[in-house]
A protein has these predicted regions:
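Conserved beta-alpha
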Residues: 1-128
Length: 128
């Protein structure tokens, strides 16, 4: 028995896969993801985008809620390296017009490897 606790908006794909696989499961959304206004400190960091070597999005929610702020504070001439953990996160970023790389393995270990290979010292991470 699997209990899928993801918010309804993020659970459908998993629920469909579980149902097609014949695995017993129930969907019990125990969390809710809401958008709030960023703090002044966060807005300051966004105004310094050119000082980061890489911008990282760790989840679909981080991309959904963070991408608009990134777009707002990014000059069209600024060439940012953007990384996404997973294809779903990359798809959300693409919907916002942002091109991103996905680490092999689609996980934190793959991300760490990519960062190490690129010698990225200063990262801005959107997670959520």
């Amino acid at each position: 028995m699997i209990v899928n606790t993801r918010p309804s908006i993020l659970a459908n794909k998993t629920n469909d896969l579980l149902a097609r696989s014949g695995i017993e499961f129930m969907h019990e959304p125990l969390t809710k993801i809401l958008s709030i206004s960023p703090s002044n400190q966060a807005l300051e960091k966004l105004q310094q985008l050119d000082s980061y070597d890489v911008i990282i999005f760790t989840s679909q929610s981080a991309a959904k809620f963070g991408a608009p702020y990134l777009q707002k504070h990014t000059s069209k001439n600024l060439n940012l390296l953007i990384m996404a953990i997973g294809l779903a996160t990359q798809r959300v970023l693409s919907e916002h017009g942002l091109v991103s790389e996905v680490p092999s393995g689609f996980n934190s270990a793959g991300l760490a490897e990519l960062i190490e290979q690129g010698k990225h010292e200063k990262c801005l991470i959107f997670c959520g």
